[in-house]
Amino acid sequence: MNEKTLKILEFNKIIDKLVSLATSSLGKELAEKLVPDTDLNRVERAQKETSDAVAFIARRGTPPMGGIHDIRDSLKRVEIGAILNPGELLKTADVLRAVRNLKSYASNDRIKTDEDNIVSELIGCLESNKRIEDRIYMSILSEDEIADNASPTLANIRRQIRNAQESIKDKLNDIIRSSRYQKYIQEPIVTLRGDRYVIPVKQEYRTEIPGLIHDSSASGATIFIEPMAVVEANNHIRELKIKEQAEIEKILGELTGEIRGIVDSLKSNVSILGRLDFIFAKARLSLDYNCVCPVLNDEHKILIKKGRHPLLDKKTVVPIDFWIGEDFNTLVVTGPNTGGKTVTLKTVGLFTLMTQAGLHIPANEGTKMSIFKKVYADIGDEQSIEQSLSTFSSHMKNIVGILKDVDEDSLVLFDELGAGTDPTEGAALAMSILEYLRNKGSTTVATTHYSQLKAYAVTTKFVENACCEFNVETLRPTYRLLIGVPGKSNAFAISKRLGLFDDIIEKAKEFLTQDDIKFEDMLMSIEKNLNQSENEKMKAESYRLEAEKLKKELEEQKRKLAENRERLIQEARAEARKILLEARKEAEEIISKMRRLEQEVHNAQRQKEAEELRLKLKRKVDSIEETLELPLAPKNALVKPPENLKPGDSVLIVNLDQKGTVITPPDKDGEVVVQAGIMKINVHISNLKLVDEQKIVLNNSGIGKIGMSKAKSISTEIDVRGYNLEEAIESVDKYLDDAYLSGLTEVSIIHGKGTGVLRSGIQKFLKSDSRVKSFRLGKYGEGESGVTIVELR
């Protein structure tokens, strides 16, 4: 990609922002090297990894990227047999912890990630090693300190050192507190010189305390002496220190050996961590600028929806709509200076570079970007003082370089093409350059204020006009890009608004040719028509959004209706269960009374009374069945069609639960037109009810029957083999109801032998059932332990 183009379009500023969002030197290094790619497949993958990282952050929050160090040099040293120092080992442990934290971050999500999620794949390739990580942290406290418990030997040596040091301090304190030596001591303190314990002695008494002189004060008044009484002890400490250092070297060697065993894994981890840091930096850039992933193509088609230049103030930037590549591949943008033409060029160019670098772009969903092999830009004043080139010459030199390399896979951006020289010749050159690029098949966007180029765009195939809108009333540009409309100079209108005399303006108009006047009138007509089209488009979009909103509301109301219907059904089932329980209780009372009567005397009168009770029980059960078999009124059955419907009546559309107003009387088929919000709907009167007719009509026809269909003849056994325990108990419970009401005194429950779960669960249920008098396992010939025989009361 052309380096000059990257600079002109300020791609480097986007890279600077990206670098600042990376947390590690590894991620920053990758960000600094980022350049646009020209291969569609690679760009698609780069865009996808950015999208995947955005999805990760949206679901899981900010990833833990701390502790990612560049330990590649340390790993090289490990490979050649060197021993790592404590600082290097700590950084290695940090990397292992970073790996573990990222894997935990990725796994703490109940939402399954797409199988082809690039970020998930990378994190899955990381290899943690908590054992080595913990051992390093346990052994090393800082870059300068090894922990006592790094090894038992080190702990023992340091204990000996501390004991020896305390012994020396005690001896030296005895000397400085002794009345014999007090007048020789400069200060009653024990201090260190090198690694030897000494005491400060006055210069004039240095011979009074036998020992080794190690240092003196700056003034020479104090001599630091190691008394002979502690020389041997200091020597012992020195020996222990040597042993301590040797043990530390041994520990560092062992830890380095652990690292050597996983060096390949660590090298892979470092590479992946750097890549992840870079990818998450791209995701944060996308979120910071409210970006989207563009739809990619290699057909030179660009469609930008509400694109916002990322380097402009978010509060003031005006979004642009831009397209090229469908009906035209050359766009001529005209309009006043500072009207936004250059910003449009830079937005298109920078969006292309960002897209091909795998970065999201600040635009709306549905934005499409093409992959170009080459991107060229001639924007701004590139005059070279050193080469003594004029503005025109400087631009022309740049343009010549572009024209030499351009081809059909090139995007070319020109700002004020042909400016800086005679207008007639400049316009002619500009048209010739555009024609050359058009014949080459390049995608070209050029800004200009030459009227000749407007006419060229109108009359040339695959070339289109555009302008940056200018508000004559406020004398300010709106920065809106209008494609299909040539720009107007607005010189007369602006001059008039600024107070220029009318007679001067009218005289100026006389100098215009008739063709100029017709052309300006045509531009005014085109702009007016486009504005009307834009207004209609905005109005249509408003209607569309309102319709979508209404659709969502209707769907939500439909969902609530379904929920209410389900709730009513559940309530009805609960009521049915309540009725059944009451019936069971009453039946138990009747049967109990019947059995008492049968057991008293067997005369005809008693038998007659027993028969009456049996008939009463049967009528009760039949009554319950009839009650439970009454249908629930379906949602459409609750409506009684209104009579005498007329326009203006307020109605409720039942299946939509939406209020509306009748517009037409019923036709021959019983349909009326109803205004519901912004929609007019044909509805049958059976699906309507007047708003003031809120009565719910419940009849005995419809659907949704909830019934308790008891068999006319009840079997003496039930088979629940293959059921789970809950299903089995529910089936047994219902079966015992029927058997009990039918007057059976003994039934068999076939549960099978198996694991015994069904047998024990069912028998536990039977123990607490008031309908059961007793139960037992089957005997030989009855099914043995695979069957439970139940005696009913």
Curated annotation (Swiss-Prot):
The highest taxon in the source lineage is: Bacteria
Q: Name one GO molecular function term.
A: mismatched DNA binding
The processes (GO biological process) annotated in the record are: mismatch repair; negative regulation of DNA recombination; rescue of stalled ribosome
The UniProt transmembrane annotation reads none
Query: Which EC number(s) does the record attach to this protein?
Result: 3.1.-.-, 3.6.4.-
* UniProt KW keywords: ATP-binding, DNA-binding, Endonuclease, Hydrolase, Nuclease, Nucleotide-binding, RNA-binding, rRNA-binding
Instruction: Please name the top-level EC class of this enzyme.
Output: hydrolase
- Assigned protein family: Belongs to the DNA mismatch repair MutS family. MutS2 subfamily.
Please state what the protein is called: Endonuclease MutS2
